Every structure is written in C-alpha cells, then in structure tokens.
C-alpha cells in the first residue's frame, strides 16, 4: 500500500538549459588562443602558495580529472600545462543577463538555478509554439548566434527529468524524455546521476545493493521510507519519473551576498575598506537585479589564523543603496576588536529581504 498517493502531471512542457563549462567558455570566446587547451577558472597555485579552489574548468581540463571545488594545487598536479584564470565575475554576470533575456522571449516562467542554468516552463509560451523541442533548439541557436556560447538542453514533462536530460549529452546536446520513455531512461542511469540524491544517500543506496534506476524501481516504498524517512518517499517517485515541483519564476531568496578570499592577506585599513566597498557595490547590484530590498547588513571577516567573525546591523528602513551598505559595513568593521593578523576573507551580505515596493526609490 502506498503511504502517499502517486500524482503525476505529464501535461507540462519543461526545458532545462545548462550552459557548457560557462565561465571557461566565456574566457575561450574572448580569447580564441585558449581553444583546445585545458583552462581552469581559479587562482594559479604557483602564485598563491598552493591556496585556492577550482571554480570550474573546460572540457579539455576535465580529461585530466579536474573538476569544480578541487583544490587548485591538485588541479595543477594533475595537469601542469593547465592555464589558470582568476575569473571576471562581473563579465560572467553580464553574459548571464544576456542569456536570461533570450529565455524571456519565449516565456516569463523562468527559474534560474544559478548564473549558468535555468528551468523554463513553455507549456503556454509567448510565441504559441507547441513543440518544446523546437523552442529548446531556438534557444540554443539564439545563444550561439548572439552570445557565442553553447548550452545543453533537456526537455521533459517535469523538472527532475529535464535536468537529467540536459546532463545526458554534453556539450551542446539536446535530449527529450517523453512520458512513455521515462522508465527506460531512468532504469539505465547510475543512481549517483539522479539529481537531488547526495553522496551520503548514494553510499547508503549502494549498501542496500541499489546502483541504478532499475534497482531503485524494484524497492518497495515502505522499505525506502524505513531507511531514508521522508526522503524515501521522494526516491520512490524519482524512480518512476514523478515530480510535480513547479517552475518558480520568482525563487524566494533569504539573503544576497558577496565575499572574496584573498591570496595576499589584507593589513592596511585603506585596502580593507576598498574591498568592503567592492563587496557592498556587488550586493547592491544583485539586489537591483533581483528587485529586492533588505534591512539587515552582515559583515564577515576571516583572519589569517582562520578566526572568523560575523556581525550584523538591522536598519530601520529597507534599502539597496550601495553607499549606505558600504557605510554600515565599514562601521561594523570599525566596531570589531583589533586583530593584528591579516585578513584572508571579507564578505558583505544583505538579509531580511523583501520585494521592491514601487513607491520606494532606493536605487543605486
């Protein structure tokens, strides 16, 4: 007997767009000499004493086993000829904005998951195109023609399957999963490829002898709930291609922040205040992008000895004004006890967010 009823809405048309090695691809586009070479977005460990992590890398670098979140030192050891680029996140944000404008030509129901991926519900799209595959192809064409980058697309009747489909054929692939093909598609997938199933859950499933979607499909719902609690209910439905989570065009954000880690420690107050200013301006720009205002400003400081201090101030009025955010964050820093150790990391975050109110004029 099912603990929770099975409800499967197969009427929707969902596209998941995932840019191919986005940051590295932007760098290759802007510097064609990089094409065909292993490119890593991250600090060069030869210049940082081995510190730093890989933000992302291109497909050439991935051939050496390099991946996101790997230490830059290990990436260099795996591929000494890799080209390390610190990255230009303002440039990437600008390109991401271009791509989102392309999405909006087809539908307003867009849920960005990050700067380089998004879900689109094109069931009722602006152009009246019935085929989601056709829309996905048009988006791929528009992005290539106007932005000079490739993306992979997954098309299906829910977000879970669309995400798996976009990962299935990269780079520049397009995969369609119809409702009649979903079980076959899922059956062949390794369980670690299932979106939303983390490393610890994968290890636990392996301990149970579950390695593929086919294996998962054979497990009774109650057994999964006994082992995983409520998540067992989700696993049971994932194995059957069931997910009714809507594409949310306005994802709820609890905070917006910006922080930087410094290869060279900061000691001088002028340098520290300059970095606080940069972070404050970045936060203000992000608030503007997301049409949000905030009340609570948080400053995070990490010293050379890895001591981390976090302090917040709540304002009487909502704001997204860069100068005000900078002033308050600077005042917070001034209120901290002196620490002779250099600063390794600075971050500014705005919380207590609310949607922009039309009659409040608090722009940059």
Swiss-Prot record:
It is found in: Cytoplasm. InterPro entries: DNA/RNA_pol_sf, DNA_pol_Y-fam_lit_finger_sf, DNA_pol_Y-fam_little_finger, DNA_polymerase-Y, DNApol_IV, PolY_HhH_motif, Rev_trsase/Diguanyl_cyclase, UmuC. Transmembrane segments: none annotated. Binds 2 magnesium ions per subunit. The active site is at residue 117. Its main location: cytoplasm. GO terms for molecular function: damaged DNA binding; DNA-directed DNA polymerase activity; magnesium ion binding. Poorly processive, error-prone DNA polymerase involved in untargeted mutagenesis. Copies undamaged DNA at stalled replication forks, which arise in vivo from mismatched or misaligned primer ends. These misaligned primers can be extended by PolIV. Exhibits no 3'-5' exonuclease (proofreading) activity. May be involved in translesional synthesis, in conjunction with the beta clamp from PolIII. Belongs to the DNA polymerase type-Y family. This is DNA polymerase IV. The gene is dinB.
């Amino acid at each position: 007997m099912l603990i929770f009823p099975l409800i499967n809405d197969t009427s929707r048309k969902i596209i998941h767009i995932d840019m191919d090695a986005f940051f590295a691809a932007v760098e290759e586009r802007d510097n064609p000499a990089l094409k065909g070479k292993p490119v890593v977005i991250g600090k060069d460990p030869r210049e940082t004493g081995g510190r730093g992590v890989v933000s992302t890398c291109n497909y050439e670098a991935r051939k050496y086993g390099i991946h996101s979140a790997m230490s830059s030192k290990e990436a260099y050891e795996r591929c000494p000829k890799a080209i390390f680029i610190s990255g230009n996140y303002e440039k990437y944000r600008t390109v991401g904005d271009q791509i989102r404008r392309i999405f909006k030509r087809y539908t307003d129901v867009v849920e960005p998951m990050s700067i380089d991926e998004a879900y689109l519900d094109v069931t009722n799209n602006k152009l009246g195109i019935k085929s989601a595959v056709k829309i996905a192809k048009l988006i791929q064409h528009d992005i290539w023609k106007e932005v000079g980058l490739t993306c992979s697309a997954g098309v299906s009747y829910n977000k879970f399957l669309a995400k798996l489909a976009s990962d299935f054929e990269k780079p520049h692939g397009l995969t369609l999963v119809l409702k009649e093909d979903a079980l076959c598609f899922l059956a062949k997938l390794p369980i670690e490829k299932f979106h939303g199933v983390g490393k610890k859950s994968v290890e636990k499933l392996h301990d149970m002898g579950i390695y593929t979607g086919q294996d998962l499909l054979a497990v009774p719902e109650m057994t999964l709930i006994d082992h995983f609690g409520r998540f067992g209910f989700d696993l049971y439905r994932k194995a059957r291609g069931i997910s009714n989570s809507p594409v949310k065009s306005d994802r709820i954000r609890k905070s917006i922040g910006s922080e930087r880690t410094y290869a060279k420690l900061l000691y001088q107050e002028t340098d520290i205040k300059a970095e606080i200013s940069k972070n404050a301006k970045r936060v203000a720009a992000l608030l503007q992008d997301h049409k949000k205002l905030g009340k609570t400003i948080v400053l995070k400081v990490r010293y050379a000895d890895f001591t981390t201090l976090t302090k917040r101030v709540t304002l009487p009025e909502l704001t997204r004004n860069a100068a005000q955010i900078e002033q308050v964050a600077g005042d917070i820093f001034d209120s901290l006890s002196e620490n002779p150790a250099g600063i390794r990391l600075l971050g500014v975050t705005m919380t207590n967010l609310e949607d922009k109110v039309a009659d409040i004029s608090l722009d940059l």
